Amino acid sequence: MQDIYGTLANLNTKLKQKLSHPYLAKHISAPKIDEDKLLLFHALFEEADIKNNDRENYIVTAMLVQSALDTHDEVTTARVIKRDENKNRQLTVLAGDYFSGLYYSLLSEMKDIYMIRTLATAIKEINEHKIRLYDRSFKDENDFFESVGIVESALFHRVAEHFNLPRWKKLSSDFFVFKRLMNGNDAFLDVIGSFIQLGKTKEEILEDCFKKAKNSIESLLPLNSPIQNILINRLKTISQDQTYHQKVEEG
């Protein structure tokens, strides 16, 4: 298991180097790296039939796309903002575009036009479903969870299809839907609250998502494998952290 953590630390360092830009660093916060997504991309690409020399580039590339998407999400939609805030907003958009350009550059160097198409398709799907969540145009509970799953894991879905590794589609979706709901802001949780009329509380819905993610990890990954143990522990940590924060806020 120590080897996994060492590999992830190395990937994290290389990703930060790619994401580093001296001018942007002066004006906006460094992009946050989702270490759970880094872990799952590492595990997925470990199973892919690709050269060892290319594996690291694929992982970094996928995470650059994720960073670009996350950075664009940081852009404020407020109409009235101060001059300095407007500059930060413009630079945040620029940063997201810059990170997108990096992934195109890496894949073009590898001459992998098919992966460019794969990631572009995922980006299109993610943006479409972000709009659905933003304007609440989903029809029902299933529609809502489908959109959350696509926003959080479409990159994994498309990459898994590209390399014919179907189990990572369900596993990534179940895990990241749970994580997104646990880390959601008040507005996001209010959407969940609208489903209470179906006879479930927010807590029961979150518990169902936890069990679903845990079941996927236990049934789709080798028993007691390092990646299975790490993901089970992460699920528990995410759940415990949120419970702790709720208790603190409630006093």
Swiss-Prot record:
A Pfam entry, by short name: HEPPP_synt_1
Q: Which domain of life is it from?
A: Bacteria
Q: State its Enzyme Commission number(s).
A: 2.5.1.30
Question: Do you know which Gene3D superfamilies this protein is assigned to?
Answer: 1.20.120.1450
Catalysed reactions, semicolon-separated: 4 isopentenyl diphosphate + (2E,6E)-farnesyl diphosphate = all-trans-heptaprenyl diphosphate + 4 diphosphate
Broad class of enzyme this protein falls into: transferase
What is its biological role? Supplies heptaprenyl diphosphate, the precursor for the side chain of the isoprenoid quinone menaquinone-7 (MQ-7).
Q: How does it assemble?
A: Heterodimer of component I and II.
* Name used for this protein in its record: Heptaprenyl diphosphate synthase component 1
Species annotation: Bacillus subtilis (strain 168)
Gene coding for it: hepS
